[in-house]
Amino acid sequence: MKLYKKWSSIWQSKQLFLLPSMAGVFLFAVLPFGNMLIQSFSGGLTNYKAVLGNEAFHLAVKNTCRFVGVGIPLLLLLSFAAALGIYKSKWMRFLKSVYLLPMAVPTAVVVLIWKVFFHKAGIANQILAFFHIGAIDWMSTDAAFAVLVISYIWKNLGYTIILWIAGMAAIPDSIMEAARVDGATQGQCVRYMVLPQLKPVFYTITMLSFLNSFKVFREAYLVAGAYPQKSIYLLQHLFNNWFTNLEIDKMSSAAVLLAVFFALCSLSMKNLWEKEDVY
């Protein structure tokens, strides 16, 4: 009887329902990361020295940081402006659906669209020719970086707008009405009433945008291949090339460095957000 009660209490425990998920995390995340960590130290610090002294690694890190530094602020700014523009408008539901369409388009189709649009004889150069501007070889010059940023913003703008709108919908109308009664302008309402209320949403969007910025490799790879124009040679290209050449030790060391960088960025943003929230 006691044994039955013991097993019955275990079965009814809420923690039991976490076991399948925790088992999945352990098998497909913790164990592979542990194996990768061991692999990275297979030659002591030799692999880390080789990675940190690799010129291709320096170029990939520089381009990735540049992409993140340009793409995320532009995405946040444009999506917030668009969310403000359509919030509570009669077209809001329709526009929300339109903005989400790029997320439903498969990557292969997106790549085909960009190839047609930015081809030497494509739509972009025809538009430039209409204004008597010379054609640009988009994917073989530094203009490829702009194409990649545009692709990233176009793909991620929709869900970011939806998140901003969801945050705005949670702000009580009474706060905005009280501010307007006190004579606050639209700009002052946005700056002093809306933005402070959207800090949690800002943190969520920034983290999601940061993570999604590392998924743009698919477009860059399918458009320009494993060795693209140097301005869009990202960390993912480097990892892919090392994997192709079976340089697993280097790849493991670089992955550990990247994981540490991700963790530091996430913790820094979280601490900054919590500190501002306290004050």
Could you describe each region identified by the protein language model?
Residues 6-279:
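A structural signal for multi-pass alpha-helical bundles of membrane permease subunits
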Residues 1-4:
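N-terminal hydrophobic targeting signals that begin at the initiator methionine
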